[in-house]
UniProtKB/Swiss-Prot annotation:
Keyword Cytoplasm: yes
Signal peptide region: none
Cytoplasm keyword on record: yes
UniProt xrefs under SUPFAM superfamilies: Ribosome recycling factor, RRF
UniProt-recorded name of the protein: Ribosome-recycling factor
Primary residence: cytoplasm
One annotated GO biological process: cytoplasmic translational termination
Similarity field: Belongs to the RRF family.
CDD domains from the UniProt entry: RRF (cd00520)
Length: 185
């Protein structure tokens, strides 16, 4: 019983960390990355479709993304979706492809992005702590039903706390890496 609760908590904490890493990978740094456009959806024959399903996104150079749209008639819609996103990008058609130059980040924008990333990190920490609370509540319920001893309860809480500390350490490490990446010129 307790081992199942611990395993469940560990899996959920790992999902929180991975979700955080995915979220911050979408934050624009000075370098071009195809994942930058992951959140963009394009209206394709009346339905909203992720850009990844309509085109291939490659890195042309450190400051330019190249989008090869599978259906040529969707080029203008893809450009419109990129401009409508809050990424501050200005795509341009280059023959059959769309080029998306990434303007250099200003110091002020870097600081804003750092604040955003810190906020995401705090949300991830809160999510990890919520998983810890849920696991501890389940163990307390077992203790209340006299299914486990107080020693098992204490031991389980200590192990869940160790898992929580490890997950938060991973979040902090990813945050430090992203902040360093954002502040590079």
């Amino acid at each position: 019983m307790i081992s199942d609760i611990r395993k469940d908590a560990e899996v959920r904490m790992e999902k929180c960390v991975e979700a955080f890493k995915t979220q911050i990978s979408k934050v624009r740094t000075g370098r071009a990355s195809p994942s930058l456009l992951d959140g963009i959806v394009v209206e394709y024959y009346g339905t909203l479709t992720p850009l990844r399903q309509l085109a291939s996104v490659t890195v042309e150079d450190s400051r330019t993304l190249k989008i090869n749209v599978f259906d040529r008639s969707m080029g203008p819609a893809v450009e419109k979706a990129i401009m409508a996103s809050d990424l501050g990008l200005n795509p341009s058609s280059a023959g059959t492809d769309i080029c998306v130059p990434l303007p250099p980040l200003t110091e002020e924008r870097r600081k804003d992005l750092t604040k955003i990333v810190r906020g995401e990190a705090e949300q991830a920490r809160v999510a990890v702590r919520n998983v810890r609370r849920d696991a501890n509540d389940k163990v307390k319920a077992l203790l209340k039903d006299k299914a486990i001893s107080e020693d098992d309860d204490r031991r389980s809480q200590e192990e869940v706390q160790k898992m929580t500390d490890a997950a938060i350490k991973k979040v902090d490490a990813a945050l430090a890496d992203k902040e360093a990446e954002l502040m590079q010129f």
